[in-house]
Swiss-Prot record:
Function: Usually encoded in the trnK tRNA gene intron. Probably assists in splicing its own and other chloroplast group II introns.
Annotated source species: Arctostaphylos uva-ursi
Protein name: Maturase K
GO cellular component, one term: chloroplast
Superkingdom: Eukaryota
């Protein structure tokens, strides 16, 4: 990582040539192929094959940029609307590799900023934070006092030009924005970035990493209003927000928008001492200690702010307010289902004969076994009743490859749900995948499951399903509003949609 940091240091006087010196360097393509900076094996996408040749990507981008300089536009030959080609190459095939390279290039400045902010600081790793389900349990001390939660569906997907302009503002490179805008307009699947459903938007499984980056970058602008309100209002003493990125010129822009559009006059209505915000996969959850009237004020304030400042139309009915005492807090898709339950602790004095009852609220993290079995059924690991089936499409692979694919699927699921106290559902998933793996191997060798396991031993499968892997933790340090000390928020598995198709069960 130090080598990358040293090689990627950019001179401010050369920022107008931001993309072009980087895009032809070999390690950029290596990073694009590995899908990230210093990713561990658990975050890798095993779906790559020999088609993703780094040399092909490099030659194609050089050819495209040469054509752009010579003719000032891209050449299209539209034989068919579904078979468009860019300078003779298939769009669907080569655009994936082009955008993978662009994604790494645009993420470099933010990765360097993260490294520079962490330089000289020791990162404290909590060993008990081993899954996303443990995140809610860790926040029980802060969010247990919250009474209401507002579930807001993200606004409609941004236009390609607006997303490119937002990235250009941070990169400060006009040439980079022009080249990126050309590729965005040439790509036809931008509208499939988010799939609209009845009450929310969800990311498509075929999304490109660059589009996810640009979308999160754009959404972060209007959701960062919570950070501004925390600093402006003395009533908002505590805020917890997990965002993808922070804008450089955020405070200047938001301050201008709030005070020129007469939003300051209504800041006094927000008197909640606790405010927690989290967003995942097109859904946002805002939890606060207060009444439903307070959450309704937040609801209409956010809608008005989005419409006036970002010119985004969002109807109030897309924001639902639930009481945490009656509803489960499920904001991470299949990752976790958190329920707030009351807990009574009784204490008895030693000398005096009376009891003291203390009421507490605690989080119970649940494993959504029914949606998970449905996802396994769609992936042909079993039927809708949870009975294992053999994966015939993998029967032609070698024995180690078959066991590795089944074990990788289980480790991905277990990584999220290991924070739950009730792991019986995980044992059921492990049973389905192990028996499905055994049936696939038995079909490959034209044998029965009993005979195959008797010949090789049950311990062989157990070894693959219990192997531990290193998990990459991405830590963002932020200044505390009270003491000035640094506190850190963890983000798990930002690329879950890219690596695990079982995540999109809904």
């Amino acid at each position: 990582m130090e080598e990358f940091k040293r090689d990627l240091e950019l001179d401010r006087s050369q920022q107008h040539d931001f993309i072009y010196p980087l895009i032809f360097q070999e390690y950029i393509y290596a990073l694009a192929h590995d899908r990230g900076l210093n990713r561990s094996i658990v975050l890798e996408n095993p779906g790559y094959d020999n088609k993703s040749s780094l040399l092909i990507v490099k030659r194609l981008i050089i050819h495209l940029i040469t054509q752009m300089y010579q003719q000032n536009h891209f050449l299209f030959s539209a034989n068919d609307s579904n078979k468009k080609k860019i300078v003779g190459y298939n769009t669907n095939f080569y655009s994936q590799m082009i955008f993978x390279g662009f994604a790494v290039v645009v993420e470099i400045p933010f990765s360097l900023x993260l490294l520079s902010s962490l330089e000289g600081k020791e990162i404290v790793k909590s060993q008990n934070f081993q899954s996303x389900x443990x995140x809610x349990x860790x926040x029980x001390x802060x969010x247990x006092x919250x009474x209401x939660x507002x579930x807001x569906x993200x606004x409609x997907x941004x236009x390609x030009x607006x997303x490119x302009x937002x990235x250009x503002x941070x990169x400060x490179x006009x040439x980079x924005x022009x080249x990126l805008r050309f590729f965005l307009h040439a790509y036809h699947n931008w509208n499939s970035l988010m799939t609209q459903k009845k009450s929310s938007f969800s990311f498509s499984k075929k999304n490109k990493r660059l589009f996810l980056f640009l979308y999160n970058f754009h959404v972060c602008e209007y959701e960062s209003i919570f950070v501004f309100l925390r600093n402006q209002s003395s009533h908002l003493r505590s805020i917890s927000s997990e965002t993808f990125l922070e804008r450089i010129y955020f405070y200047r822009k938001i301050e201008l928008x709030v005070f020129t559009k007469d939003f300051k006059a209504i800041l006094w209505v927000f008197k909640x001492p606790f405010l927690h915000y989290v967003r995942y996969q097109g859904k946002s959850t805002l939890a606060s200690k207060g009444t439903s009237l307070l959450m309704n004020k937040w609801k209409y304030y956010l809608v008005k702010f989005w419409q006036c400042y970002f010119y985004m139309w969002s109807q109030p009915r897309r924001i639902h307010i639930n009481q945490l005492s009656n509803d489960s807090l499920d904001f991470l898709g299949y990752l976790s289902s958190v329920r707030l339950n009351p807990l009574m602790v009784r204490s008895q004095m030693l000398k005096n004969a009376f009891l003291i009852g203390n009421a507490f609220x605690k989080f119970d993290t649940l494993v959504p076994i029914i949606p998970m079995i449905g996802s396994l059924s769609k992936a042909k690991f079993g039927n809708v009743l949870g009975h294992p089936m053999n994966x015939s499409v993998w029967a032609d692979l070698s024995n180690p490859d078959i066991m590795d694919r089944f074990x990788r699927x289980f480790r991905n699921l277990s990584h999220y749900h290991s924070g739950s106290l009730k792991k019986m559902s995980l044992y059921r998933v492990k049973y389905i995948l192990r028996l499905s793996c055994a049936r696939t191997l038995a079909r490959k060798h034209k044998s029965t499951v009993r005979a195959f396991l008797k010949r090789l031993g049950v311990g062989l499968l157990e070894e693959f399903f219990t192997e531990e892997e290193q998990v990459f933790y991405l830590t963002f340090p932020k200044a505390s509003s009270s003491s000035g000390e640094l506190y850190r928020r963890r983000i798990w598995y930002l690329d879950i949609i890219c690596i695990n198709e079982l995540a999109n069960h809904s």
